[in-house]
């Protein structure tokens, strides 16, 4: 395994409610990052087919027709569309953590697929608890989604979605899995001019949630976020709402294991890819001071119990 790598964090606008359009754009970004020499590429949350911000503004009844289209344009993990992306990853020879709305039977999940340089999905996980009104359209990830670190030729790569970064115990379990590079997948988060809007759902706070992972975990963090431009408000079903008046919402960044910002940020309404040349040995330098699952821990006094069992809706008597 090479210790010196180039990593990439995507900041881009989805192709709203357009499955094939989203696949094509995702492939184009993979190809672009690979041409720049990237080895590991991180994508925003539900980049395909975009984050459904309208669930924060409309009632379920008002939103139903749009969500029906959203369901149709979400991607199945085993599908021709995913096969196209896997083929592009294989051709590029990179490692990708892809964020998308996963359609499985009659339910949607906020998913991340970890795709290696052979085009193989080596890890697949779902957000364990959708945030607030997300629960109206997305299901919960089960115990298998607690495993969020993949051992790859480019190091041990992890991923979490959005406010999963606020889940203290989930972060701690990730650190116990010995993460090197963490992909922090986010939607667009808009600067607010609405006094009632919770401050902890702002770019400043959400960026801070990811920043903490770099320092606690002594790992590199690729914060990848969506943007939303004003001309696409209607497509995203948020036209005329106060909380999207300040368009953009991008806040992508790459952090070092010491918590340093390694790149200059893009403008909130700017599409692009952030790149950083990294050396995984930096992790061990940081851990000399701070290893919260090692020498700087007291498991005899404080420890974590993990249940990786996947709960199922149907059990058979002879399995009990």
UniProtKB/Swiss-Prot annotation:
It catalyses: a nitrile + 2 H2O = a carboxylate + NH4(+). CDD domains: nitrilases_CHs. Residues 5-280 form the CN hydrolase domain. It is an enzyme of class 3 (hydrolase). GO terms for molecular function: nitrilase activity. InterPro entries: C-N_Hydrolase, C-N_Hydrolase_sf, Nitrilases_CHs. Keywords: Hydrolase. Optimum temperature is 43 degrees Celsius. The active site is at residues 45, 127, 162. Gene3D superfamilies: Carbon-nitrogen hydrolase. Optimum pH is 7.0-10.0. It holds the Pfam family CN_hydrolase. Its EC number is 3.5.5.1. It comes from the Eukaryota. Belongs to the carbon-nitrogen hydrolase superfamily. Nitrilase family. Nitrilase that hydrolyzes preferentially benzonitrile. This is Nitrilase.
